[in-house]
């Protein structure tokens, strides 16, 4: 959700229980504007909160002029002092995939994991137990990146692609119509497309290249991993991810108000295919 309209955005997303105390809201409003100025971001998004056992991580993201360029991620424990996180890598994801359970809320906390490594002694090969330490900060980076790739959402038409390449905010976007807002096909993943290149030429011919340049939610696997609900007498559409419980996307049809927020433990619902 855009930091500049934070209070309205939190109000619209509050149906899922994603609220913040008045002092946290005031701190965020001020500190995110300073983050935008100091890091020279085009936009700052309040991404959400990852709940820890000792403390919670408040997450913000900086967006450059090209809206699909990699976003810079920052975290804070008090909503005032922000620290920049390193970019996520495949190695981080592999390393942290073995860590299960809740976050602690301490970036310097280290998880211990025992794994078997092959050791050569002459012609003989032995398997030796090695204790690997994984920092919570590394796990935080990896989980945020996974959530972004899987469930960050944007409505169709909110961004447009110029013939020269850069992707910009569509200043003429006036919101989806009520009938369009109820369809999953009207929402895209807010990331570089992955499935788009697999479409046939006939399917691509039906798309508008300036608007349909991202992957649609309607083809997400497993099918049924999104819940779409109309609230406030059809004045608000709310999408909730069942794969990453805690992710809520909201959009008020026929207005420019949209955004998403994640408030959860940072754990994926791996049982979802068996629950549907």
Swiss-Prot record:
One of its GO terms (cellular component) is 9+2 motile cilium. Its main location: cytoplasm. GO terms for biological process: axoneme assembly; cilium movement involved in cell motility; motile cilium assembly. The keyword Cytoplasm applies. Coiled coil: none annotated. InterPro entries: RSP9. It is found in: Cytoplasm, Cytoskeleton, Cilium axoneme; Cytoplasm, Cytoskeleton, Flagellum axoneme; Cell projection, Kinocilium. Keywords: Cell projection, Cilium, Cilium biogenesis/degradation, Cytoplasm, Cytoskeleton, Flagellum. Functions as part of axonemal radial spoke complexes that play an important part in the motility of sperm and cilia. Essential for both the radial spoke head assembly and the central pair microtubule stability in ependymal motile cilia. Required for motility of olfactory and neural cilia and for the structural integrity of ciliary axonemes in both 9+0 and 9+2 motile cilia. Component of the axonemal radial spoke 1 (RS1) and 2 (RS2) complexes, at least composed of spoke head proteins RSPH1, RSPH3, RSPH9 and the cilia-specific component RSPH4A or sperm-specific component RSPH6A, spoke stalk proteins RSPH14, DNAJB13, DYDC1, ROPN1L and NME5, and the RS1 complex-specific anchor protein IQUB. Interacts with IQUB. Interacts with RSPH3B. Interacts with RSPH4A. Interacts with RSPH6A. Interacts with CFAP61. Interacts with LRRC23. Belongs to the flagellar radial spoke RSP9 family. This is Radial spoke head protein 9 homolog. It comes from Bos taurus (Bovine). The gene is RSPH9.
């Amino acid at each position: 959700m855009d930091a500049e309209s934070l209070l309205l955005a939190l109000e619209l997303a509050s149906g899922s229980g994603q609220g913040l105390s008045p002092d946290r809201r005031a701190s965020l409003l001020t500190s995110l504007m300073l983050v935008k100025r100091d890091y020279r971001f085009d936009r700052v998004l309040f991404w959400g909160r990852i709940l820890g056992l000792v403390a919670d991580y408040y997450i913000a993201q900086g967006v450059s002029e090209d809206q699909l360029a990699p976003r810079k991620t920052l975290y804070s424990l008090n909503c005032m002092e922000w620290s920049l996180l390193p970019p996520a890598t495949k190695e981080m994801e592999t390393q942290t995939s073995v860590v299960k359970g809740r976050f602690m809320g301490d970036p310097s906390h280290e998880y211990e994991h025992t794994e078997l490594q092959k050791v050569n002694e002459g012609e003989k090969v032995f398997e030796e137990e090695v204790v690997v330490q994984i920092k919570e900060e590394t796990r935080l980076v990896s989980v945020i990146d996974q959530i972004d790739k899987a469930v960050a959402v944007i409505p169709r038409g909110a961004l447009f692609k110029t013939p020269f390449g850069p992707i910009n905010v569509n200043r003429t976007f006036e919101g989806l119509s009520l009938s369009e807002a109820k369809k999953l096909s009207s929402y895209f993943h807010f990331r570089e497309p992955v499935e788009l290149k697999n479409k046939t030429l006939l399917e691509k011919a039906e798309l508008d290249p300036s608007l349909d340049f991202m992957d649609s939610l309607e083809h997400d696997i497993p099918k049924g991993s999104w819940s779409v609900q109309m609230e406030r007498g059809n004045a608000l559409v709310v999408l909730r991810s069942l794969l990453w419980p805690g992710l809520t996307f909201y959009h008020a049809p026929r207005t420019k108000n949209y955004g998403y927020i994640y408030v959860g433990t940072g754990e994926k619902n791996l049982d979802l295919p068996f629950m549907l």
